[in-house]
Amino acid sequence: MTAAAAATAPNEVTEMATETTALSPRFYTTDVKAMNELSVEAVRAEWDKLMAEFAADKNFGHFKRTDDWAFDPNDLPEDLRKELTDFMVSSLTAEFSGCVLYAELHKKGFDPDMKTLFKFLARDESRHAGFINECLRDFGVQVDMGFLVREKKYTHFSPKFILYATYLSEKIGYARYIRIYRHLEQNPDHQFHPIFQKFFRWCNDEFRHGEALALILRANPKLLRGHNRMWIRFFQLAVFTTMYVRDHTRPAFHRALGIDPEEYGMDVFRITAEISKQVFPDILDVDNPKFLAGLRKIHELALRIDASKKKGFFGKLRAIPLQLGVGVRFLKLLFLPTQANALPEEIRVAPAW
């Protein structure tokens, strides 16, 4: 590598954020015109009230390091330090993915309601990503977000897929953060990084984002009918499965928090499923014993795939039937009985967890 190339090469955490894998957060594009053709008139009163909440910007100034901020990464064992960095980079990438998508929808949109919403969402996600990047400074690194915008691969989704995926992402983000926050309220000795102190107000941003996306979906009921019901089921399962497998790659992180990743995951799934009753006509039955059994099997196969891929060309060949096995297990989970849900007249729910 030449000196000039070395000077412009991304650092390690930027490379981590740029990677596209089955478990890593992705960057998305969509059909801006089709998104702006959706209407919120059917939920106008609730929409205007929610936009006023966004405009009030109650979390302005929250995402800053306070005077009592105290953290030294050298105080952590190496495995925990590595997994905390991975958690932060993954979280930053997910937040920044939303920022990039929402900013594009605001910039290129033409419907006033959509432009207003996506301006607020991009504002919040930018703050979240920027704050995590500030936290990474303690490790002597930061993600080059400009490089990320240019170099990370983008996945194109139709507007309805964007709405299903981002709604679930925002709501499961709320559930993840509030579950950790409530746990640390009761177990403060496990709070090994000050970022967790921010999670209560942070997760309410995520919840509010999900409320806006729920209103769009409910205002356009065709997105919740017919074959779309199977897509909704698919996205629920994809989000839950990805979280379950990814969280099990951070044993030291969860051990330091005093949280069992499986128990934590199931709690998060239950919260997310309960919230999702505001908008989805079919809810995954996460308490069906076959659901957890299927997740465990997919995790087991994922471990075997990872081990095989590290053994060169023939290892990658041996991974192929294992990958097919993951697909089979996923399909079995997809066709488990779901809970039929009559959509409530009052759409919005309160972040009461």
Where are these regions (language model features)?
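Non-heme di-metal
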Residues: 2-353
